[in-house]
């Protein structure tokens, strides 16, 4: 039996009832809370500790080099960016040459260092900077390969990019010659569109490639708009020669992008989910760069075992609730949501509850200033189409229905953000999760901020979901179901992310996986997949949650369970070391950072702490 028929049946019942009745029933069903007193805001919370109590930051010979490289790179990107909206996929030859030169020069500078004269922190920073340079070089190669694959769909691509790059070189456009270029590209695009739409002569164009080319066409339009505004009206000759050809080209580019996106890409409906898989080779390279010595097949097998473990645990909780199985238990839990307008109050309650739990067990240091130096923002209805739950970092963003949402969307949002689901993830977004990471990153090892890894960022927050579950943070069977729902979700993310990025699973199949095997609302599942493939996150970002959590669990077992460190010592040390791939962090915690990247394989899934994945 799948969850989809059950979900649709329940939704039909709920949608037939007034929303007030649904809220009233859920409020009656929700277990009472026994949260400790709310944390208060006092001026002393933001006072620094005495100098003698501040942990000493290790001096690093590499810190000035890292700072200089970061400044050089940011300057290059600032000057050579062709589209100033943060979403530019364009391949620009001159910029690529400058990037390659920057990487090569810095690699040469690092080679001048004698690793025998470096201490552990210096060696670590050197390896992290080396890794970042190598990743930059790999990204440049990958970008060029993708450009070569699509340039045939966008005739004149190189000519238009040359105009944009000339502006970055501070060269004024020659009006007459520029007009000729724009008109020639317009005619070539028109001819290419005719061939693409001709029934007899249409070449084989994959939807994936067509959609990628459509993104480039859109980026060219945005770049050219800024380029045109820069000179039009300020240079009479430019306006006289260029304005009309530019307007005609812009119209042609818009039509060409629509052809690529809607007709060849099959994405005329904005609700259509389309992915752009990176392929097996790129997946393997990305995992290797993170120090993950497992193949995609091995990770997917571990995710299947974790998912089965979660469902068995859910069945136990379901029996305690008097439910037939985990699906019925999950359906009951989804009814335990607060009334409209009450979610912000619940978030504060749950945030404080997590802090009290951590401090009562001396698990890590939660600085007073970190407990309330975050804001809360409600996600807009539009943003909830991609992020139907919580988001976090420096602050927390909360998903909950608004009065203007359609009735069914209101119910989806209420059910998906119920008390028990929320209790399982508020600490993920705030403390000890992302907000605490941000607090420490602003004050310790700040030069390592550019070495961020999603396996560290999301793995740390996910690790705490696993640890808190083991320590009994879920006080009721309903709370356990809430935590197990999200743990199942993380396992499913490995399955669908690796499946979609390899091209072996479609986005629609990913949605079905989340609905049928995890228990998501259909609309929430679609939003989760849309967010994963929209391009705002790296292709392995969703994989990083549970895999990073497994890595941290294994590292905890090595250093605390077997190594004799205290809980606080381990967790505080992780936070103070700063962001990096966990494989590198492991070397630092064992005081064995060498001159080269770690060579010994780390089979963290074999660690007894990860028995649920074996």
Feature-to-residue mapping (PLM):
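N-terminal acidic, proline/glycine-rich, low-complexity intrinsically disordered segments
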Residues: 2-3, 25
């Amino acid at each position: 039996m799948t969850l989809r028929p059950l979900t649709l049946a329940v939704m039909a019942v709920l949608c037939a009832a007034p929303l007030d009745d649904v809220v009233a029933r859920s409020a009656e069903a929700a277990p009472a809370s026994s949260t400790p007193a709310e944390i208060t805001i006092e001026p002393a919370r933001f006072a620094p500790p005495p100098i003698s109590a501040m942990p000493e930051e290790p001096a690093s010979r590499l810190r000035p080099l890292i700072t200089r490289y970061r400044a050089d790179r940011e300057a290059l990107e600032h000057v050579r960016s062709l589209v100033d909206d943060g979403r530019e996929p364009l391949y620009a030859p001159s910029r690529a040459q400058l990037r390659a030169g920057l990487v090569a020069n810095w690699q040469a500078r690092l080679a001048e260092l004698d690793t025998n004269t470096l201490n552990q922190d210096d060696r670590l920073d050197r390896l992290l900077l080396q890794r970042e340079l190598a990743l930059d070089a790999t990204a440049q190669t990958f970008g060029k390969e993708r450009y070569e694959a699509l340039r045939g769909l966008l005739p004149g691509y190189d000519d238009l990019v040359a105009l944009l790059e000339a502006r970055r070189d501070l060269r004024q456009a020659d009006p007459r010659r520029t007009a000729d270029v724009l008109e020639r590209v317009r005619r070539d695009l028109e001819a290419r569109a005719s061939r693409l739409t001709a029934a007899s002569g249409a070449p084989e164009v994959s939807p994936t490639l067509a959609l990628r080319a459509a993104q480039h066409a859109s980026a060219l339009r945005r770049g050219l708009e800024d380029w045109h505004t820069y000179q039009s009206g300020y240079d009479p000759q430019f306006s006289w020669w260029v304005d009309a050809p530019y307007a005609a080209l812009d119209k042609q580019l818009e039509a060409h992008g629509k052809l690529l996106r809607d007709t060849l890409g099959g994405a005329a409906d904005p609700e259509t989910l389309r992915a752009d898989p990176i392929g097996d080779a790129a997946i393997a390279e990305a995992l290797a760069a993170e120090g993950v010595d497992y193949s995609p097949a091995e990770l997917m097998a571990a995710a299947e075992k974790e998912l089965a473990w979660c469902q068995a645990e859910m069945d136990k909780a379901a029996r305690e609730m008097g439910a037939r199985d985990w699906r019925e238990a999950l359906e009951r839990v989804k009814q335990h949501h607060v009334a409209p307008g009450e979610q912000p109050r619940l978030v504060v309650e749950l945030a404080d509850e997590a802090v009290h739990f951590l401090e009562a067990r001396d698990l890590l240091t939660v600085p007073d200033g970190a407990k309330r130096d975050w804001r809360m923002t409600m996600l807009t209805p539009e943003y909830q189409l991609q992020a139907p739950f919580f988001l976090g970092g420096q602050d927390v963003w909360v998903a909950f229905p608004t009065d203007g949402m359609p009735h069914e969307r209101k119910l989806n949002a209420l059910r998906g953000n119920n008390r028990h689901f929320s209790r399982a993830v508020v600490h993920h977004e705030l403390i000890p999760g992302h907000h605490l990471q941000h607090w420490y990153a602003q004050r310790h090892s700040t030069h390592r901020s550019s070495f961020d890894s999603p396996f560290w960022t999301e793995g740390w927050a996910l690790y705490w979901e696993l640890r808190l579950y083991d320590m009994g943070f879920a006080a009721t069977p309903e709370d356990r179901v809430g935590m197990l729902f999200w743990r199942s979700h993380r396992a499913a993310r490995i399955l669908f992310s690796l499946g979609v990025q390899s091209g072996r699973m479609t986005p629609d199949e990913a949605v079905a996986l989340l609905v049928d095997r995890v228990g998501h609302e259909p609309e929430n599942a679609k939003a989760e997949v849309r967010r994963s493939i929209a391009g705002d996150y790296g292709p392995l970002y969703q994989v990083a949650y549970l895999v990073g959590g497994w890595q941290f669990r294994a590292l905890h077992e090595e250093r605390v369970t077997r190594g004799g460190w205290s809980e606080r010592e381990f967790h505080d040390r992780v936070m103070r070391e700063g962001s990096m791939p966990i494989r590198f962090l492991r070397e630092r915690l064992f005081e064995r950072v060498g001159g080269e990247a770690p060579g010994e394989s780390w089979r963290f899934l074999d660690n007894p702490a990860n028995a649920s994945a074996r």
